[in-house]
């Protein structure tokens, strides 16, 4: 505090005090809008660049890549600089640091601020080269904290942000590598499955072709068998026609004649039995008439008194039995011929049988 009684301080006291560092030029007043709006429309120089010192050439500013990298780092850390400064504040040296003002002022005067270097956009630089460019010794950082605490905080925040960015990048690379390995494994599995499916498809296609060929062969064999059966049927019919067993005109009625032949033997047997009974009755009537028309009355009387006995009638029937059996055999033979020739000879045979029975009865009556 100045003494109001001594408005002019002692010059010796002033000479003993170390020279104070000049206060930094205050930044121009910005508008109410966000500071990042300026970076989106125009390029601005970094704030840590000291324009008051003499310009030594473009080599001291660094390359265009360095300027662009610093610009990208400042824009990236604009939103998180406050929190980073709060976290770095307690650990960073403050105005009451052990460094004296004299050393700080001298070193600050001798040291020249350098341009910051950061990661390049393509990320081709290594960590060693980055640290070599942007690293600052702790004593210099302490001196800078005395001179420009805002700049020191920004440097610390940039270092922390670079470390976090590097960590995120490493994690992202690891994740991409893991995804690539997973996709390669899936591709290998799918390739194996595709090979199996292709082999199965090839096998099924060949089997399908073989089955189609076998089906065609079976169809051809069936057609050949049908044609062979037709030829055999025609050959059998031709042989029958050649041997005379079946005439061409009666070939159509061959099946019906065979069915009639199966029924004719039973019908012929019953008809012949009925015919024998009828013949026996006719024989009795004729015998009775014969005795009635005898010229001799004595004989008529004797015949009346002594009629033919049953034994005589049976003897007469037995004597006529061979003729009747012969007629039955002839009728069966004629029936067989009628079946082969498709003619109804059975009725004719029966008619002839009746004719023969009439002849036998007439011969017996003449006797």
Curated annotation (Swiss-Prot):
Region (Disordered): 1-57, 79-124, 294-330, 343-367
Ranges of biased composition (kind: Basic and acidic residues): 38-47
Comp. bias intervals (Polar residues): 294-309, 317-328, 354-367
Coiled coil residues, start to end: 166-245
bZIP domain mapped to chain residues: 148-211
Tissue-specificity statement: Ubiquitous. Strongly expressed in mature pollen.
Subcellular location: Nucleus; Nucleus, Nucleoplasm; Cytoplasm, Perinuclear region; Cytoplasm
Keyword Transcription regulation assigned: yes
Renumbered residue ranges of the record's region Basic motif: 150-171
Effects seen without this gene: Pollen morphological defects.
Keywords: Coiled coil, Cytoplasm, DNA-binding, Nucleus, Phosphoprotein, Transcription, Transcription regulation
UniProt-annotated stretches for the region Leucine-zipper: 176-190
UniProt xrefs under SUPFAM superfamilies: Leucine zipper domain
Molecular-function annotations in GO: chromatin DNA binding; DNA-binding transcription factor activity; transcription cis-regulatory region binding
Positions of modified residues (Phosphoserine): 70
GO cellular component: cytoplasm; nucleoplasm; nucleus; perinuclear region of cytoplasm
Gene3D superfamilies with a match to the protein in the record: 1.20.5.170
Primary location: nucleus
Low complexity biased stretches: 82-96
CDD domains: bZIP_plant_RF2 (cd14703)
Bilayer-spanning residue ranges: none
Functional summary from the UniProt entry: Transcription factor that may participate with bZIP34 in the gametophytic control of pollen development.
Subunit organization: Interacts with NEAP1. Forms homodimer and heterodimer with bZIP34 and bZIP61.
The protein, known as: bZIP transcription factor 18
Organism whose genome encodes this protein: Arabidopsis thaliana (Mouse-ear cress)
Protein's gene: BZIP18
């Amino acid at each position: 505090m100045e003494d109001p009684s001594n408005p002019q301080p002692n010059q010796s006291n002033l000479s003993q005090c170390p020279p104070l560092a000049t206060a930094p030029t205050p930044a121009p007043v910005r508008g109410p809008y966000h500071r990042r709006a300026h970076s989106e429309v125009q390029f601005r120089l970094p704030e840590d660049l000291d324009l008051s010192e003499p310009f030594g050439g473009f080599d001291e500013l660094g390359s265009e890549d360095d300027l662009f990298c610093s610009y990208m780092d400042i824009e990236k850390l604009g939103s998180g600089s406050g929190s980073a400064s709060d976290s770095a504040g307690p650990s960073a040296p403050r105005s009451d640091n052990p460094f004296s003002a004299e050393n700080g002022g001298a070193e600050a005067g001798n040291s020249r601020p350098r341009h910051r270097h950061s990661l390049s956009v393509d990320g081709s630089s290594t960590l060693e080269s980055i640290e070599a460019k942007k690293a600052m010794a702790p004593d210099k950082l302490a001196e800078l904290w005395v001179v420009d605490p805002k700049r020191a905080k920004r440097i610390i925040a940039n270092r922390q942000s670079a470390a976090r960015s590097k960590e995120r990048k490493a994690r992202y690379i690891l994740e991409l590598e893991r995804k690539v390995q997973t996709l390669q494994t899936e591709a290998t599995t799918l390739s194996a499955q595709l090979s199996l499916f292709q082999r199965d498809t090839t096998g099924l296609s060949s089997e399908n072709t073989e089955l189609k060929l076998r089906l065609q062969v079976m169809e051809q064999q069936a057609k050949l068998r049908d044609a062979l059966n037709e030829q055999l049927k025609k050959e059998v019919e031709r042989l029958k026609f050649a041997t005379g067993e079946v005439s061409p005109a009666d070939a159509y009625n061959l099946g019906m004649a065979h069915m009639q032949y199966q029924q004719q033997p039973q019908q012929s047997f019953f008809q012949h039995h009925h015919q024998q009974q009828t013949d026996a009755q006719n024989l009795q009537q004729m015998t009775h008439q014969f005795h009635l028309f005898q010229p001799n009355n004595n004989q008529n009387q004797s015949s009346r008194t002594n009629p033919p006995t049953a034994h005589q009638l049976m003897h007469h029937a037995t004597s006529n039995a061979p003729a009747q059996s012969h007629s039955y055999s002839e009728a069966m033979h004629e029936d067989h011929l009628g079946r082969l020739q498709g003619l109804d000879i059975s009725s004719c045979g029966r008619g002839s049988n009746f004719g023969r029975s009439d002849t036998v009865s007439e011969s017996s009556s003449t006797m």
